[in-house]
Amino acid sequence: MKNRLILLDGNSLFNRAYFALPPLMNKDGFYTNAIYGFAMMLNNILENYEPTHMAIAFDLKAPTFRHKSYEDYKATRKGMSDELRMQVEPLKKMVDAYGITRVEFEGYEADDIIGTLSKLAENDGFEVMIVTGDKDALQLASQSTAVYITKKGITELERYTDAEVIEKYELTPLEFIDLKALMGDKSDNIKGVAGIGEKTGIKLIKEFKSVEGIYEHIDEIKGSLRTKLENDRESAFLSKKLATIVRDMPLEADMDELLVKSTDYERLSEMFREFEFTTLLNKLKKEQLGKEQPGKEQPGKDQQEPGREKQSADIERADIIYEYDRQWLDSVESADIIINMQAEKGEESNCPDIEKLYIKNANNIYVIDAENIDDAKAILENPSNRIIGHGLKNIYKALKKCGIRIANIFFDIEIAEYLIDSNNTNFTLEYLNNKYGLENFESLEEIIGKGKKELKLIFADKERLSAYFINSLYSIEGCYQMMGPEIEKQELSFVFNEIEMKLVRVLSDMEQEGFLVDTALLRRLSLQYEKEIAELESSIYSLAGEPFNINSPKQLGVILFDKLALPVIKKTKTGYSTNIEVLEALQGKHEIIEHIMEYRQITKLKSTYIDGLLGITNDKTGRIHTTFNQTIASTGRLSSSDPNLQNIPVRTERGRALREVFISKEGYLLIDSDYSQIELRILAHLANDEIMLDSFRKYEDIHTRTASEVFNVPLDEVTSELRSAAKAVNFGIVYGISDFGLSNNLGISKNEAKKYIETYLDKYVNIKAFLSDVVTEVERTGYSTTIFGRRRYIPELKAKNMMVRNFGKRLAMNTPIQGTAADIIKIAMIKVYEYLEESGADAKLILQVHDELILEAAQEQAESLKLKIKEIMEGVAELLVDLRVDIKTGKNWLETK
């Protein structure tokens, strides 16, 4: 095999890793995301490109020759954050443990080291591969040297040889230096020539070949472009000097010194344990034992073309069975079954949402067309088979339409990742595959495109598509094998198995059932609001003295502040602010303000809710089928989208009336069950606060009691104003509100708000102690937990910025309360669902909103179901104070309130 040297730009790549991954910390509060991402990159490179020689170049703190030539070189760069700086030395030690040579040289940058080593290696007949996040390295590309630029994430790379640089940029690699000399580089504070960008720069280089060539022919260049070049002649030549990577450093390097050495498994394992890199540690153990990783190529497979990445689609990983023995398939039991589906069959099919179903067990992969979907029934409906996938809610729902109900929804890697890393917002299979160090394969986005150019699956290349779904099974399996132990390690088994995985089927059925809407009423409301909007427009034009675009903040600002001379409350970069806070501050100053506020309220209701709901009501069912999102809120709360039914306005009379359009079908009633003050009850339990516990046990109005305690007045003398203030403080404490936030909510001074909070905490001493203890514990562990064990990692508590740290404190205090409430409502949903299923009751769960569940039940069963549902929901958790559920029935949602 030809010698292959891989050179890595250490600084570029660990910066890339730091910003590509969410903040990660170990139990000691030590940040690890840059180290983790860098390790992922190293694993990917070592596995997929098999170097014989390797070196990682790092910058030193000392100034380089470029700083001596130009003292403002890189002067605009912000200093390295403490969170990143603390990871540099451990990262270098990790590189040493991998057996990879580190190279640093005072007075030069990592780029120069790479440039010099690559030239030496080329002269010795090596094939060279450079990996960096900096396009400056493209000047080093040649027939023997390929430059790999990080594309997105931490493992996806884009390859450039000299031919590929020319093809993409129409410039040779060396001409890239001249382009940077003209354009400059903000990140390095290289000035270039003011006013020349990439397009003009490329045009000049193509014509004159270099900076020197441009100035030799400056007389041929006309107009303002010539003026720009003449004004910045000195800067152009200096910029070229700064942009040129040195390839003849006084670096005495023997290629044998760069040989990839044996990994120090003991040292690396110790580091991974310290950093709590469970997945990398498991992978390292398998490598050490000589075990094959999921998705790794089979022995005997031909080596890939040197310097090219292995293509998983070409790997024969298992027997892929298109014509299979159904009898054998039916006999599979007590097995881990990995599944994925290719969607988009079409409305007319008996199986409308599935084109193909992909199933993998230990040895084989089965590809089942929609027409033969019944062949999968036995294996999926056998409760002894553990079904594992990514996004199982949608797969379960699609299969249910085909007459198949998965019996054992065992492990969803998307949900597992949501629990393992509560701050992660990316749960795509591609991201998880990269994060857990599995073999890269062509992504779905690469096959079908995205945005306006995105293809429907049925028009995509069939072979590439099939390869993607087959590879996805290995990816899901690999993630599952690594996530399972991590779930146990973080003590998340109850939350994962008993709450989140059981909830998948519940949410899927709720989405499929949908909520019936009165479309006739929606249309009447649309016409009514249209008329009211027209009347308001007329009134506003009359008061303004002229017609204008009311929806234009700029035009509205001119009317209010220039023409009507109202006091300016706030300005933005583009002019006057006319947001709701400004309008509220102007109330009473002019009659037009109330009209504008009402106009905005009605137009929002009409466009977003009235017309919006009409547009997404299913023509066949007459129902709205929202999507419940299980992996969005870090607290564990569910959210809904398309449409967001949790955001139906309730503060205004018109908003509340909107609930009237949500109805039950003929012969049925809606049952609305709502936990009463659940978060305050949880707070009373967690803090073991006698005043609050006593109030709940006596069935007192908790806000009146709080007002009595905080404002030192008898219960019977608490006014509505005092009760409102106490309510704001109660819920402010739950949500970790600041004195600034409370002052805004109550319209009082910041000092008054601060005094309210201090008085509250002086009275409720156990709550004060609880909140303080929670913050201390989170500072120690890095995460906050619910009663049931759900974790939320709070790296903000380690931040340098005081505002960010204070925000972290509020998150730490709020998470046990709000997160526990989220767990309780989810458990309640599961228990109610299971009761309805086991009892055969003619009722279905159709909506969850915050602490509220809505069912649609047969009219004759509604009263008995009310009692049973109340009993179930109030018995979900044993707290020091009873949970209480308010429950009502009605023909529409408004009637249940």
Label each PLM-derived region with a short phrase.
Residues 155-156, 162-180, 315-316, 350-488, ...:
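Active-site-proximal helix-loop-helix substrate-binding element of RNase H-like nuclease domains
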Residues 232-371, 454-650, 669, 679, ...:
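Conserved "right-hand" nucleotidyltransferase catalytic core of DNA-directed polymerases
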Residues 6, 10, 16-53, 71-72, ...:
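Conserved RNase H-like, two-metal-ion catalytic cores of nucleic-acid enzymes
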Residues 455-458, 505, 512, 618, ...:
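Conserved catalytic core of nucleic-acid polymerases
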Residues 1-131, 135-159, 235-238, 244-252:
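Noncatalytic, basic helical substrate-engagement surface that gates or grips nucleic-acid strands
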Residues 2, 51-55, 100, 123, ...:
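Non-catalytic nucleic-acid-binding/docking modules located in mid-to-C-terminal regions
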Residues 358-363, 420-446, 450, 468, ...:
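Function-dense linear segments that define catalytic or interfacial modules
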Residues 534-538, 542-594, 762-810, 814-816, ...:
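C-terminal polymerase-core module
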